[in-house]
């Protein structure tokens, strides 16, 4: 399999995304984006068991330190972020050090935020090992930790030096996490590319069988969609990047109310995508057949299409107001005018939203 490359250029900060097989064994590639002689690999207990030792061997001629997180969203906190910084300082890492995020979205987010803050900013490389991180979390420079009040409330924009996607890491990804990652691929198609959505409908059976040829193609397309949006609007100033939050205002509220880790992020995103599509249909933006196609595709993946019955409408609405997409005390929701065409709207008032959440 030929390694594919997607080039990102955010504010004159270019970096590559590599997508291929056996990239974690490619010494030249993994050393190419490290400018100094120090690295620190941040991973979690689950991923480290599979991939840490081979990656450390690549950097055997470097000062190579490691920090291993417990596995789970509930550990993406200021406490563990501070522990990473303490390890960097205590091991005397300099400004030319490079952090390597080996893991899923949690590892990438907290590692990137540590890199953004240590000595006012050092390099980091994303090595995402979950499908969700490969198509979304590792691309675009958003780094953050959670706070009890809300998800990703504390963070920074800090672009990686490279994103290295080894498809072989998907072989060790549990089925539930693999399917959760599909939600972000569906989201990318819904935002910008109706043809891509149709391709997903046609190829989903093969994708769920982890066909690497098809997976490489859809990961590349999802990465290109995110690349184009991030290149145009790195820090969500124009509204273009806000489109990437389709379904996420609902999803983040669901995650917080259930307790981080009870639902995987992609599972909450799936329910959020359906809520956004249903609301779009209610407001006469999206036709019923398109809504049905979205529900059918997510159901085929075995992802949730309803928010949990344990959450009531008042709780969900209140939690949604802790979202970063609130401006002038109004929720800015991402809605769909068609498959492949998302828009930002502040034309949904509380009364309408509460009625929608209560009655569907």
Curated annotation (Swiss-Prot):
Zn(2+) binds at residues 184, 248, 265. NAD(+) binds at residues 71-76, 105-109, 129-130, 142, 151, 169-172. Keywords: Amino-acid biosynthesis, Aromatic amino acid biosynthesis, Cobalt, Cytoplasm, Lyase, Metal-binding, NAD, Nucleotide-binding, Zinc. Catalyzes the conversion of 3-deoxy-D-arabino-heptulosonate 7-phosphate (DAHP) to dehydroquinate (DHQ). CDD domains: DHQS. Binds 1 divalent metal cation per subunit. Can use either Co(2+) or Zn(2+). This is 3-dehydroquinate synthase. It catalyses: 7-phospho-2-dehydro-3-deoxy-D-arabino-heptonate = 3-dehydroquinate + phosphate. It is an enzyme of class 4 (lyase). One of its GO terms (molecular function) is metal ion binding. It is found in: Cytoplasm. GO terms for biological process: amino acid biosynthetic process; aromatic amino acid family biosynthetic process; chorismate biosynthetic process. Pfam families: DHQ_synthase, DHQS_C. Signal peptide: none annotated. Its EC number is 4.2.3.4. Pathway: Metabolic intermediate biosynthesis; chorismate biosynthesis; chorismate from D-erythrose 4-phosphate and phosphoenolpyruvate: step 2/7. Its cofactor is Co(2+); Zn(2+); NAD(+). Belongs to the sugar phosphate cyclases superfamily. Dehydroquinate synthase family. GO terms for cellular component: cytoplasm. Disulfide bonds: none annotated. The gene is aroB. The keyword tRNA processing does not apply.
